[in-house]
Amino acid sequence: SSLMVAMASKISNTPLNTFTIEFPNTPNDESEYAGNISSYFSTHHTKHKINEEILPQVPELIQNLDQPFADSSFIPTYYLCKEVVKDVKVALSGDGGDELFAGYGQYDSFAWEDSIRQRYPDCVRFALGRLSTLLPERHRTRSLKRLAYNNCYDGMTAYSSRFFSFPERAKLLNRGNFALDYPEAEFLNNFIPGVDWLQNICQNDFKNYMVDDILVKVDRMSMLNSLEVRS
């Protein structure tokens, strides 16, 4: 987290030690960006490469999660902790910065969608959403379909369907006692009364996604390496 590095550098009397994982030749690699931040704040920076050689160890890592866990970033988190503990015993993670200060790219997407809602009437957006269902299900058209679909609804309803659309949920939850009345949007709109939709989304991610995903991941993988990580 560049924000965490900036704040920690401001209050520290000595240069910070910073660490990151490098994914060579992949679009997920942020090591160059991390290096730029390190240079700007004059930290002692170390990056560790990760590649397919770690795959045979993944089943063992899964066993140490203690529960079903659907975030594959626990794998690089484990190897980062494994390397960091060679130099320090307590580390500060960057967790929480994106949720508190709207750092995720998805927040920009939500803001763009919201600007479209303000610009075009419901009838136009609904018609485009219906037409988008005729597009083929391909990688290049998926984002366009999602954009048109999301703009059929208000911001919070669209946010609550970011993983599965309502038709997809209807297909998955089509039996037994599963509820299909979609109460999430009403809940999210009132997550923090009196603030705008972006603050509600950030707080929802902070109190749910970060707590039930990010902190669990970091806690399991850091303790597996006898490293204490604080957020």
Sequence positions of predicted segments:
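ATP-dependent adenylate-handling active sites, centered on carboxylate activation for C-N bond formation
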Residues: 1-185, 220-231
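Structural motif
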Residues: 70, 192-205
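Short Ser/Thr-interspersed hydrophobic loop/turn segments at strand-loop and sheet-helix junctions
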Residues: 84, 206-221
